[in-house]
Amino acid sequence: MHELIRLFRLAARMSGVVCLLGLPFSTACTSAYNPLQDFESVSPATELEIPKASAPRAAKYPSEQVTRGKYMVKLLGCGICHTDGALVGEPDYALNMAGSRIGIAYSNPMENKYPGVVYPSNITPDIETGIGSWSESDIVRLLRSGEASHDRQLLAVMPWPTYAWIVDSDALAIAAYLRSLPPVKHQVPENVSTGQRASSPYVHFGFYRSRH
């Protein structure tokens, strides 16, 4: 009997708790040492959801700078390409500067059945479809060098070589004006390479002469 009791006590130490039924003990259950007995149980901390990103607020710039930027944008004719419908004389002012679904062929359609086509981008500060994530320096660099994000060089359909002469104050004013526009969510078609068929309409600018 003593040997049996010793074995049960050993098992109790190993397994934590053993309930002994029908044996002459003062208690029916023997508990092993609980290493957490000196600690107080507490409720878990409340988990907070990560707030969703909100639409970017219009950047604050001096009104004189924004006015100058608006003048420069009109002078350079940015809206002719970057406003939907303007390339065919039917501008949709609800999509002012929000990009064009009508593209511009950059290779001669007289020589290429399927010319390469660029669709002017959304240059409002929309975070998803526009330039909402661009800084002032990003915009100025694009104006002067045609270098977009990720070191991507733009085709000269956008006449950035001509814009290289723009002085700092005017370039920053253009950036201020564009960043102060209301963000417009408007996705334009993807550009197509020469030889690929464009799924959206396009125009072509060029000079031609008669062969006769």
Which residues are covered by each model-predicted region?
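Bacterial signal peptide processing site
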Residues: 30-32
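C-terminal capping alpha-helices of c-type cytochrome domains
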Residues: 133-149, 160-188
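Gly/Gly-Pro-rich "capping" loops immediately C-terminal to redox-active cysteine motifs
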Residues: 35-51, 86-138, 154-168, 192-204
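The canonical Cys-X-X-Cys-His
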Residues: 69, 75-85, 139, 174, ...
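Electrostatic cytochrome c docking/interface patches
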Residues: 44-74, 88-89
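Sec-dependent N-terminal signal peptides
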Residues: 9-21
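N-terminal secretory signal peptides that target proteins for export/translocation
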Residues: 1-10
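C-terminal motif of bacterial Sec signal peptides marking the signal peptidase cleavage site
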Residues: 25-28
